[in-house]
């Protein structure tokens, strides 16, 4: 959703559901656990609090292959199944931005972290373990 980066979530069930998608395709699925600590004032962090016009524009730009942020990390809602359906309809031109935002306003964002700077990864992220699902 936020372009190239190292993606994390603090929601265990969300991570499991995402990994299980690989299992359904006949691939191995692993759940990696990390310790992630950062001081927000030391990093450029772009945060989206809701599925709003700014989030929709940023995701649209990233999905078009354009990198528009120099942030060390982007934080915001992940596109779950219902959100993906709305995005697909919006990108296909089936619904307007206003209609998409009207549908998205009822969704509570499941937060994801997209670390986009190698420096932040090396300074703030520590591997703990892996578990095969």
Question: Each predicted region: which residue ranges?
Answer:
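Conserved NAD+-utilizing ADP-ribose enzyme module
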Residues: 1, 16-17, 21-133
């Amino acid at each position: 959703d936020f372009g190239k980066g190292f993606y994390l979530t603090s929601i265990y069930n969300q991570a499991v559901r995402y990994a299980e998608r690989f299992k359904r395709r006949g691939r191995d699925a692993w759940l990696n656990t990390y310790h992630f600590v950062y001081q927000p004032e030391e990093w450029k962090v772009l945060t989206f609090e809701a599925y709003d016009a700014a989030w929709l524009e940023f995701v649209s730009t990233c999905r078009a292959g354009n990198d528009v942020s120099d942030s060390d990390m982007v934080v915001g809602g992940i596109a779950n199944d219902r959100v993906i359906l709305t995005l697909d309809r919006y990108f296909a031109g089936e619904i307007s931005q206003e209609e998409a935002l009207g549908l998205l306003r009822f969704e509570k964002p499941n937060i994801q972290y997209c670390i986009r700077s190698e420096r932040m990864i090396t300074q703030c992220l520590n591997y703990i373990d892996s578990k095969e699902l």
